[in-house]
Every structure is written in structure tokens, then in C-alpha cells.
Amino acid sequence: MEFMSKEGYDKLVSELNELIKVELPRVINAVAEARDKGDLSENFEYHAAKREQSRLLGTIRFKQNILAHARVLDHSSL
């Protein structure tokens, strides 16, 4: 369980939305463009884009997991 402030929770939600709505489509597009350039076995751009996609998906899953187990602290009750 992750304890966090409302501000911290909102910031994490905002970061996650940015990753899903902006960064992920950009990376998916980069993978598709690199794939169209031909032979994948020697295509550095494709492999770099796939590594970036994998890293990004891991970050998204990590943040989703934190939010799924987050408990927002109410400062007024402390």
C-alpha cells in the first residue's frame, strides 16, 4: 500500500495520463515507421523504438500499480 497526499496522487495520475495519451502513441508510431523501413534484423531504429516501447509500458504498469494500491492521506484528520 502506498500512502500519498492528494497532490501527489493527482500528480501521478497526470503523469500516467501523459504517458498513455501522448508518449505511448508517439512510440507506437515510431515502431511502425521503423518497421516500414525494411529488414528488421538490421534495423537499429526499429530495435531502439521497441526498447523504448518496452520501457514505457513498464513505467505505465508501475504507475498503474502504485495508483491501484494508493491510499490518499487526509491531512485534516492527522
Language-model features: where?
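N-terminal cationic and glycine-rich segments that engage phosphates or anionic surfaces
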Residues: 1-17, 21-51, 55-61, 67
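Glycine/charge-rich, flexible interdomain linkers and switch-proximal surface loops
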Residues: 43, 70-78
